[in-house]
Amino acid sequence: MLKLLIVDDAMFMRTMIKNIVKDSDFEVVAEAENGLEAVKKYDEVKPDIVTLDITMPEMDGLEALAQIMAKDPSAKVIMCSAMGQQGMVVDAIKKGAKDFIVKPFQADRVLEALEKAAK
């Protein structure tokens, strides 16, 4: 089982991802509601993959991505956002994200991104 950290300020989005992965090779080991929590939880649980929302309070996902990548350049992070603007996608990939999922997302797309990042 690969360990997954889910980061989103919306509980229903975290629950949706948990439901999508419940019968897969991914185990949710931690959740966070903002970027500050994400960085802390990343250090605590050392997940294999992180799903990371962009728009969150306290610290946004792009800043959390930068901090995680600075600590662990091999981190596997998948960005999730309702804002699929090309510039934001490019920025996330340049900062080290392995993939970008636009909300609302489909189960197949989430699993595809996770499996791709796991390789």
UniProtKB/Swiss-Prot annotation:
4-aspartylphosphate: modified positions: D53
Keyword Protein biosynthesis appears in the UniProt entry: no
Cofactor, how bound (note): Binds 1 Mg(2+) ion per subunit.
InterPro entries, alphabetized: CheY-like_superfamily (IPR011006), Sig_transdc_resp-reg_receiver (IPR001789), ST_Response_Regulator (IPR052048)
SUPFAM superfamilies: CheY-like
Residue span(s) of domain Response regulatory: 3-118
Compartment(s) where it occurs, according to its Swiss-Prot or TrEMBL record: Cytoplasm
UniProt GO MF annotations: metal ion binding
PROSITE patterns the UniProt entry points to: RESPONSE_REGULATORY
Record GO biological process: archaeal or bacterial-type flagellum-dependent cell motility; chemotaxis; phosphorelay signal transduction system
Binding annotation for Mg(2+): D8, D9, D53, T55
Entry GO terms, CC: cytoplasm
Post-translational modification as stated in the protein's UniProt record: Phosphorylated by CheA.
Name of protein: Chemotaxis protein CheY
Gene field: cheY
